[in-house]
Amino acid sequence: MSAESFNPSPTRSGAATAGAAETPDTAPVVAWQQGATSQQARWRSERGSPPPARVLVADDTLAANTAYQHACEGTGLLWQGDFNNARHLLQALMRRLDRPPRRQDAPKNEGAVVSADPAVAFNRHRQAQGQRARVLSMLLIPLQSNYRIALRRAPDLRLACEQAWGPADAQAPATEDGRVAHSVAPLRDLLGIVSAFEWRKKGVPLPALGPAPDNRIHPHYGVFSPLRGEYLDMVAQAPLPAAVQTGGVVFDIGTGTGVLAAVLARRGVAQVVATDLDARALACAADNLQRLGVQQQVQLKQADLYPGGRAALVVCNPPWLPVRPGSPLERAVYDEGGRMLLGFLNGLAAHLVPDGEGWLILSDLAERLGLRTRQQLLDAVAAAGLQVLGRIDTWPTHRKAADASDPLHAARSAEVTSLWRLGPA
């Protein structure tokens, strides 16, 4: 999977995964003791984490070391102090998590920490990142029914929350009392919502869509932001099959933000059918296609992979790492067992017109991390009754590729992303 900008709970351009919608009646609740009174509220977690079993009320008097100890033990801290101080406390928790261990705390067998096996190193990195996220998600913020945060110096996040979670509950009364909550969310999630709100507002300029300023994709909350332009450039520049040039239909499987469909439409493709299973992604794609003025060329359909019919070209950019997501947040990054990749390959031949092609956009990062071999990929292509017609390669230019402090630097710095041209064998 690419190291593109990451909105919370993303559906990637290429991911066709959706869960059941959560309603106030089905959402989990978080409970705490407010003095002598027991209280509870709707629990919101974009990681899909259960609410903390134990929650303490906290305010500005809480020391960072004490908060860190509670958070590491899985105790939620429901903040009722100054909002800016909550942000400072979250930063203090981050510093403690990111602090190198003292020498006396380091394992005796240091070889167990740094492994030469890239798959082992990757799994340890994921475990460390998961633990970090769990600890940081223990600092909780109460929200009113209209998404207002009734804390001192709290910003107005109502519009950002509505974009992320949908309309506020108009039936429930709001209150100025910060101790009363209609719902509770980790501060970390709220800051992610703010970041996503800003990304959506300003958009992401992508040269593959043409010259500025009419080349921006506006990712909605929960939809992956396509910041890695190198794979988009391949789609913008690869020769189109003759069947497309004579008016054939193109399928974009797992459209996400709609960026690949838009790139193809900007290339002059007259008819693109773009699919995704996730409602957030389809709404995002519709918005972007409208902004870019190509909505007449692209038809959006809610589908798990393929729509009906056949196409002259089928484009798919699935999640690149075939491992199990640890949370809904990771569905854009990880695809357990390569379900989407295999689904695309196994359905391709049946959905191509004569002389049609499939374009698979895939990084070899999984191979470099020991999660899949090149031979396994080629075997899957052959088993689907396909052959490789050609391949275009590109190399990453994103920050992580040059970050020597990244635990996965060796794999990321050598990563190659390819556009595989596939056809029936």
Regions found by a protein language model. Give the residues of each.
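Conserved SAM/SAH cofactor-binding pocket of Class I
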Residues: R228-C316, P322, G326
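Glycine-rich S-adenosyl-L-methionine
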Residues: A279, L329-V353
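Short "lid" loop at the C-terminus of a central beta-strand within the Rossmann-like core
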Residues: W320-L321, G338, S363-E367
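Short alpha-helix
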Residues: F344, L369-A384
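Class I S-adenosyl-L-methionine
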Residues: L378-P424
